[in-house]
Amino acid sequence: MIDKVYCADVTPEMEGKKVKLAGWVYRKREVGKKVFIVLRDSSGIVQVVFSKDLNEEAYREAKKVGIESSVIIEGTVKADPRAPTGAEVQGEKLQIIQNVDFFPITKDASDEFLLDVRHLHLRSPKVAAIMKVKGTLMQAAREWLLQDGWYEVFPPILVTGAVEGGATLFKLKYFDRYAYLSQSAQLYLEAAIFGLEKVWSLTPSFRAEKSRTRRHLTEFWHLELEAAWMDLWDIMKVEEELVSYMVQRTLELRKKEIELYRKDDIKTLKNAVPPFPRISYDEAIDILQSKGVNIEWGEDMGADEERVLTEEFESPFFVYGYPKHIKAFYMKEDPEDPRKVLAADMLAPEGYGEIIGGSQREDDYDKLVQRILEEGMKPEDYEWYLDLRKYGSVPHSGFGLGLERLVAWVLKLDHVRWATLFPRTPSRLYP
């Protein structure tokens, strides 16, 4: 019986071995009495050569087959340093599962067209590489979280109130009332810490923002952590240790995929080792002003400001101590400066900016009610959340990591939309 193998398993050491391959025709060319097919599967590619002199029937089938046709091939491995993988297969049998006459994606296809046919674009090896890196980053996150004693929980997606501001909520009819798509699992994770202490979740989050920047999606994957008994400095240490492990482990396991995008430019990834640099918001404003950026103390930093700031660093770094009025209601006021909150963002270098937003949470009932009122919201809409401050409240902190933003930085992508399977933006809901 002939062993079925993956394309990447065909190596020079298998010289003379009979193999069976199943995959899709990635490239094809004809030279004289030979047809060269580059076969693709989830593992990679391998070249298969069909010779008229060796097997005329298989050669005729190979001549018929089109790009992206699905096929099963049998043949014998032959070492060849000219082949893409150092070995090729001498084709002896080709079974066409489905022949494709014309594949719509061409080399010069525009980005918008590729997004229109995203269901077909996903089969590209470069797109598959992104998804492998993304999956490995989460595999690494799970490894670290498990060994550090965190519990995974599964919060709801349908919610009744806002976490990050009511203007960015997606509203939907829920029987005889209205519900919203979750902006963040944070409030539910805060409830879970009273039984589990250190919790995390990975869920889709939804933001009805009409932002058209390279780092915004209306639906993204959100890795969120929340822990009892931790202050801001404790949670920043968790953030840098987690991100460092995710990046270094992925470098170890997905070097080939990362090099497709970064070539040998991996210095900033290797630099992602704790402790990450830390600067205050005040220092960040001073740096920006010294570089000619028109920004005043108290203003929020957008993508442009963050891009300039990242030029100062060759690794991820923290900005902490933000003004209270530009941050969310649940963040704890700085006891040493009531103008500020105990919050910190982690920014990625090379212009990528914020990948994590975190803070110590307000654990005092009266102060939290006051902040809710200051934001023009109703305390009764947050009754259950306020209950957490009435029954054994403790100091606690947490953060959220935008997975697509992390992937975009790791692979130097020009937009986060390439880091998700089917991107959702203000102008795109298909396919």
Swiss-Prot record:
GO cellular component terms listed in the entry, alphabetical order: cytoplasm
Signal peptide, first to last residue: none
Reactions it catalyzes: tRNA(Asn) + L-asparagine + ATP = L-asparaginyl-tRNA(Asn) + AMP + diphosphate + H(+)
Key words, A-Z: Aminoacyl-tRNA synthetase, ATP-binding, Cytoplasm, Ligase, Nucleotide-binding, Protein biosynthesis
PROSITE patterns documented for this protein: AA_TRNA_LIGASE_II
Molecular functions (GO terms): asparagine-tRNA ligase activity; ATP binding; nucleic acid binding
Enzyme Commission number: 6.1.1.22
One BP term from GO: asparaginyl-tRNA aminoacylation
Location in the cell: Cytoplasm
Enzymatic class: ligase
InterPro entries associated with the record: Aa-tRNA-synt_II, aa-tRNA-synth_II, aa-tRNA-synth_II/BPL/LPL, Asn-tRNA-ligase, Asp/Asn-tRNA-synth_IIb, NA-bd_OB-fold, NA-bd_OB_tRNA
Keyword Transcription regulation carried by entry: no
Homology family: Belongs to the class-II aminoacyl-tRNA synthetase family.
The protein, known as: Asparagine--tRNA ligase
Gene giving rise to this polypeptide: asnS
